[in-house]
Amino acid sequence: MRLMIREFFQKYFIDPIKYNTGYNPVNTLVYAIILGIATLLVYKVLKRLKIEINNAFFRALIPYMIFGAFTRALTDAGVFRELISLFPWDILPGLCNSIFCPFSLT
């Protein structure tokens, strides 16, 4: 049983990253489920903190969306290649900082 689970994760999650073969239906579905759960959790936290989700909220998020798309494009273009070889655990340099830095400043 353990071997089957290990082979499953190897085939559908590890190998696509290791060999850069991209997404497959299994990992795409799992990532979509994780995104849905994360979205619900963030919504519940915002609701508990009594933060209104309105136009001002979305306007405040626009710079982070632009910065995220920009850093992803630069990463795909190979601009951060040296940085990734130094810090391989950071797949999207800058993006994680753009998400978590505002929370550390509050």
Curated annotation (Swiss-Prot):
Pfam families: DUF63 (PF01889)
InterPro entries given in the database record: DUF63
UniProt name for this protein: Uncharacterized 12.3 kDa protein in fus 3'region
PANTHER family found in the cross-reference section: DUF63 DOMAIN-CONTAINING PROTEIN, HYPOTHETICAL MEMBRANE PROTEIN, CONSERVED, DUF63 FAMILY
